[in-house]
Curated annotation (Swiss-Prot):
This is Ribosome-recycling factor. HAMAP family: RRF (MF_00040). Belongs to the RRF family. GO terms for biological process: translational termination.
């Protein structure tokens, strides 16, 4: 049974990775995930923006970044520009404002293509985990053939469950992109 829980944990990790990737897609609405992973050169090293500042949503099209150290404002602005996210930071004293532009139809279509590609990659990862798990089950000499078949069926049920969740996340994001 421990191999089944290991398989489920691996599949959950693959789903979470997909979910994080999808959250960072720009939909035209302000979302802290757009800039959280931007790297900024400060203190002689590079750090993630989420470690340097508080990121909040001012309204549906604007993010406000409040650095923990006001001296990092210009470095944060430069980091956002360098990240090439098509976002323009606006420094106002000790905060940075980012207006999120309305996406064009062409951009939306491109993001939907990326979303579908990432969705398929996540499903492939889930299926690879299933294959690894089934291979381990077949190599386990302690299990009878019937037990192996039963476990394979449970692994397939897990695979179906996680693939369905990926499809649901994809549909939600596509709907969000289409409604802009």
């Amino acid at each position: 049974m421990s191999s089944l829980t290991d398989t489920e944990k691996k599949m959950a990790a693959a789903l979470e990775f997909f979910h994080k990737e999808v959250r960072s897609f720009r939909t035209g609405k302000a979302n802290p995930a757009l800039v959280e992973t931007v790297t900024v050169d400060v203190y002689g090293t590079t750090m993630r923006l989420s470690d340097l500042a508080s990121i909040s949503v001012a309204d549906t099209r604007q993010l406000v970044i409040s650095p923990y150290d006001a001296n990092n404002v210009s470095a944060i602005s430069k980091g956002i520009i360098a990240a090439n996210l098509n976002l323009q930071p606006d420094v106002e004293g000790t905060i940075v404002r980012i207006k999120v532009p309305e996406p064009t139809a062409e951009y939306r279509n491109e993001v939907i293509k990326q979303l579908r590609r990432k969705s398929e990659e996540a499903k492939v990862a889930i299926r690879n985990i299933r294959r690894e798990s089934n291979d381990k089950l077949k190599k386990d000499s302690d299990l009878t053939e019937d037990a192996v078949k039963g476990m394979e069926k449970k692994v397939q049920e897990l695979t179906d469950k996680f693939c369905k969740q990926i499809d649901e996340i994809t549909k939600q994001k596509e709907a969000e992109l289409s409604s802009i």
